[in-house]
Amino acid sequence: MKNYGIQQYFLYIMHKIIINLSGILLNNTKHNAIMNPLTSFTKTIHTKGRKIIMEALKRVSPEKAGIHSQSIIEFIQQAQAEGIELHSLMILRHGKVCEEAWWKPYDSVTPQTMFSFSKSITSTAVGFAVQEGLLSLDEKLVDIFPDETPENPGENLKAADVYSLLTMSCGQENDICYQLKSYDHWIHDFMHADFKYKPGTMFQYNSTGTDMLCAIIKKKTGLNVSEYLKPRLFDKIGMTNISCRLLPGDIEMGGSGFRVKTEDMARLGQFYLNRGIWKGERLLNEEWIDMATSRQISTVNPVFDNHDSNWQHGYGFQFWRCIPEGLYRADGAYGQFAIMDPDKDVVIAITSASFCPDRLLNIVWEKLLVGITDKEELEESGSYEQLKHLNAELAIPGLWNVRNRAHEDEWGQIRYQVSGEDVPCFADLTGGPGTWGNYGRKLSAISFEFQRTECRIHIEDEDFASDLYAGMDGTYHVSYVRGEKFAASACWEEENVLSLAVRALKTVSGTRFRITFTEKEISIRRCPLMPQTGEKFSERDWDHLVLKA
């Protein structure tokens, strides 16, 4: 870390505290964590009447951790040059944070949907259950779920066990989640699906199989995965504000439904690098850590059709092996990664909205890894100052700052009401990958107030009213709708067409709206904000609805 003078150091700490306290007060919400200064300190978290004292991770410069700042700069620049939308980056070396960055409007305190990164959390819960003697790897599904088992189960189903679920080799040719019309009886449907292959012999990606592990944890412990892990892992290593989507039966969707913060991703990775130890306390036995993170099964076969090279190096217990020898990762859709390098004692946590996660991983190998030296410490360089400046400026570009003052005054005085068919409430209209179901409410009316740097969009649902603020200064502005954090940016695309980009910050993306104003009505079209690579918004299919003045 660079040697700060006392005055500069004091100002730095006060700056961080003020920023985070201001965000908490302005957003009228409580956050469990605040951004940390460069040194370690403790913070107190109150959880259901219990007080937890959590020590923050130490902060150092990359050079103080033996990493070249220039390699981090080049990673960020290369990802951006290739159009990969990064949301956060955190690097730990020897348990210390040596790089942390968030692309505004994403931040350090908002948990984000992890998709299949969730599987590594579920796997960890299974490890604790095995350690406590509540479960064994060779325990058969037909014995755990006798009431859900077919009357005459086939030999492959009878052989399916916990190990085969952990290694994505239960024997099913396809994940039933793509075939189900309803999840009401999903455990029954899983057990009655075709188990075509002998368990343990054929890798096939199966998120419902991971959800079955959650059902097993609940059946064995009476607790959901997050409840079970809270005193055993989360509280111990400082993971806070963890949530998970529920399936019917009040069972957590551990295959894809967890939401965590970037630092919590890094903490989980460090826990695995520590081989189950945290602050000198053994939490999970190292035999499990070794099994979970080593290659248990090949991922190259005729059934698992994935030609991306980063998914062809084997699979452990819900962890992927990586192209560079010795590395493994927790891996979620659209580029939610915690990459662990045991030899270098490094964790790289990334969140993003990318349809090219394979390319994102390759940029990690090509740019980041080469800058991690075997030295404990490097001399400070001007690159660290450049990196700090780059981190401070990182942001998802908002819509181009184009105003239409004459029409803004005219149309900003009108309340547009829904007429005819029902329209989903605004939060449901926005959606985005990783949204947990719908609120099920209807939109009633909407109005616009164009201000100096933003547009206040007053949203009236049938049971709720709130304001969404969209930046009209080329940036995203953050506000709350139904208690959820949204970011929005707007500009005039044509004389009477307002373009509005809205992101639900708990998810990886959001929705692009085109709002066409006429004398007595507005016409709203929408499409996903995250198109396929190379696809233009003009080529998308847009949903359409009309509101009248």
Residue ranges of predicted features:
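Active-site helix/loop module of the DD-peptidase/beta-lactamase fold
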Residues: T113, E132-C170, H192, T221-S256, ...
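Peripheral terminal and inter-domain segments
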Residues: R50, G382-A549
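Active-site-proximal alpha-helical segments within enzyme catalytic domains
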Residues: G209-I216, S256-I277, I289, Q336-A353
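A short, well-structured edge-of-sheet supersecondary motif
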Residues: S71-D107, D345-I348
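Active-site SXXK
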Residues: G95, Q112-D138, L165, L213-I217, ...
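Structured C-terminal helix/loop/strand segments within mature extracytoplasmic catalytic/sensor domains
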Residues: K51, G332-P397
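Short, charged, amphipathic alpha-helices and their helix-cap/turn boundaries
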Residues: I67, K96-A101, K140-D143, D175-P199, ...
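Active-site Gly/Thr loop motif
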Residues: D290-I348
